[in-house]
C-alpha cells in the first residue's frame, strides 16, 4: 500500500501583537526667568552677578519689591483687569498684549530698563540687548553708564533708544551727555532722580580697561573658573564706560570713572537740575525714582511726560518703600496727565499684569534681561523677553483679558 500522507504542518502561530508605542516624552518644563538666572550664575563670576543684584543676599529694595509682588493677588476674571483693558475674550482666543508706551508702539507693556555696565556681562552686551528688544518689539533704555557708547548702540538698531541719565553735580558733564544722546537720535530721556552705585565695584575693578585687580584668592579663583567670560572680556572692544570717555581728567578706566561717579551722583532729587534738563532736552522727559505724591506733583511742574515709580537708589541701610506699594497713589494723582510706569522685582508675566492692575501703563525689567544676556547673549535676551510675553498672555487669558491697547495711564 502507498505510504500514508505526511501530517499537515502545524498552523502558524498567531501573529504577535505589535509592541505598544513608547510613551510620549514628558513635556519640557516651562521656561522661567529663574532658569536663565541659574544659567547666568554658571557663566559669570559671583563677584559680577552679586554686584548686579546689589550684594548677597539681594538688596533690601529688591526683597521689598518681591514681597509686595508675592502679597498681591489679582481678582479673578475681568474684575482684576487693568483700567481700560479689553475684556471678554472668547474661550481659547490668544490675547494681544500690544500697547503704546510714551507714544511708541510696543509688543507688550514692557521696556528694557537701563543697566550700568551691561557690557561686562557679555561682550557688546548693550548692542545685543537692543537688537533683541528690536526683534521682540519693545523699547530699549540705554544707561549713560553703559560699556558700549550710545552712538554704537543707536547705530545697531533702527528704533530710537531711550537714554537714561543720572543727576550729576557737574552740569557741563550732563550737557555733554545730552548732546551725544540727541545726536545719536534718542527720543526719550529718562532721568534717575537719585542714584547709588554698587559700592564694591570701585574697590574690585582696577586700571587697564576695567580688569579686576586686588581680589581675594577666592575671587581670583572664581574668575579663573569662568574662562569663557574672562576671555570674552579681554577680547572686547570696550571694557569701561563708553559714554564717559574724556569727561574725567584722571583717565577713562573704571578705577578713575567709578570713584568720580560716586562723588558726582546725587542721592536726592534736585528739582532745579531737572527743570534745567527739561529746558535742554527737546524730546520726551521721564523721571525715574518717583515714590511719593510730592515727587509726582514736582514731576508735572517740571514738564515730564512720564514717571517711573521705582525705589532704585534707596538707602541700603533702611527698608525702602516697595515700588508697587507706592504705585496706586502716584497713578491716581497722575491719571490722564502723565504716563506712569513702574519697575522693581518684575520676574514674570504675572508680575507685569499685577503692576498694570495697580495703574501702571508699563513696566521696566532689568535683571531679567541681564540673566538672558549672560546665559546666551542676544538669543538669551530674546528668550527672556519671549518668556515674559508668553506668561503675560497666559495671565491675560486666565483673567479674560483680550487686549491692553488703551489700558493703564498712557497719554
PLM region descriptions:
Residues 172, 176-342, 350-354, 358-361, ...:
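Alpha/beta enzyme core
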Residues 25-70, 322-342, 347-411:
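Alpha/beta catalytic cores of nucleotide-metabolism and tRNA/nucleoside-modifying enzymes
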Residues 111-117, 160-166, 255-261:
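Short, basic, glycine/proline-bearing loop/turn elements
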Residues 106-145:
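Glycine-rich active-site/cofactor-binding loop and its immediate structural neighborhood
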Residues 135-156, 160-174:
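A gly/proline- and charged-residue-enriched helix-loop-helix capping module
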Residues 25-103, 209-269, 406-407:
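An N-cap/entry alpha-helix motif that binds or orients negatively charged groups
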Residues 1-26:
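Long, low-complexity Q/N-rich tracts
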Residues 54, 118-122, 142-143, 166, ...:
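Glycine- and other small-residue-rich loops at beta-strand/loop junctions that grip anionic moieties
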Amino acid at each position: 500500500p502507498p505510504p500514508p500522507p505526511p501530517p499537515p504542518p502545524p498552523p502558524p502561530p498567531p501573529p504577535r501583537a505589535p509592541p505598544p508605542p513608547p510613551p510620549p516624552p514628558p513635556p519640557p518644563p516651562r521656561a522661567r526667568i529663574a532658569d536663565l538666572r541659574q544659567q547666568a550664575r554658571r557663566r559669570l563670576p559671583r563677584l559680577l552677578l552679586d554686584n548686579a543684584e546689589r550684594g548677597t543676599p539681594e538688596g533690601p529694595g529688591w526683597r521689598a519689591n518681591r514681597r509686595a509682588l508675592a502679597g498681591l493677588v489679582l481678582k479673578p476674571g475681568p474684575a482684576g483687569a487693568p483700567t481700560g483693558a479689553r475684556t471678554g475674550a472668547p474661550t481659547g482666543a490668544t490675547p494681544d498684549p500690544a500697547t503704546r508706551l510714551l507714544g511708541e508702539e510696543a509688543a507688550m507693556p514692557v521696556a528694557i530698563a537701563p543697566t550700568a555696565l551691561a557690557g561686562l556681562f557679555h561682550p557688546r552686551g548693550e548692542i545685543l540687548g537692543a537688537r533683541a528688544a528690536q526683534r521682540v518689539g519693545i523699547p530699549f533704555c540705554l544707561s549713560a553708564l553703559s560699556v558700549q557708547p550710545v552712538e554704537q548702540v543707536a547705530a545697531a538698531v533702527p528704533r530710537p533708544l531711550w537714554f537714561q541719565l543720572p543727576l550729576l553735580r557737574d552740569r557741563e558733564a550732563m550737557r555733554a551727555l545730552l548732546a551725544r544722546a540727541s545726536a545719536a537720535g534718542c527720543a526719550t530721556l529718562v532721568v534717575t532722580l537719585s542714584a547709588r552705585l554698587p559700592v564694591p565695584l570701585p574697590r574690585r575693578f582696577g586700571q587697564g580697561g576695567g580688569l579686576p585687580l586686588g581680589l581675594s584668592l577666592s575671587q581670583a579663583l572664581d574668575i579663573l573658573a569662568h574662562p569663557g567670560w574672562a576671555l570674552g572680556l579681554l577680547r572686547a572692544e570696550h571694557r569701561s564706560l563708553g559714554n564717559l570717555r574724556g569727561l574725567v581728567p584722571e583717565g577713562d578706566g573704571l578705577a578713575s570713572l567709578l570713584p568720580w561717579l560716586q562723588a558726582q551722583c546725587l542721592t536726592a532729587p534736585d528739582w532745579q537740575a531737572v527743570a534745567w534738563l527739561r529746558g535742554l532736552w527737546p524730546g520726551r522727559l521721564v523721571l525715574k525714582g518717583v515714590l511719593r505724591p510730592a515727587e509726582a506733583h514736582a514731576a508735572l511742574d517740571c514738564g515730564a511726560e512720564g514717571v517711573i515709580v521705582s525705589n532704585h537708589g534707596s538707602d541700603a541701610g533702611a527698608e525702602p518703600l516697595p515700588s508697587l506699594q507706592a504705585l496706586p497713589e502716584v497713578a491716581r494723582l497722575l491719571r490722564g496727565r502723565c504716563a506712569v510706569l513702574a519697575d522693581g522685582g518684575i520676574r514674570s508675566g504675572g508680575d507685569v499684569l499685577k503692576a498694570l492692575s495697580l495703574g501702571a501703563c508699563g513696566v521696566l525689567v532689568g535683571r531679567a534681561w541681564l540673566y538672558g544676556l549672560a546665559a546666551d547673549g542676544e538669543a538669551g535676551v530674546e528668550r527672556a523677553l519671549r518668556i515674559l510675553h508668553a506668561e503675560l498672555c497666559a495671565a491675560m487669558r486666565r483673567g479674560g483679558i483680550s487686549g491692553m491697547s488703551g489700558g493703564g495711564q498712557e497719554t
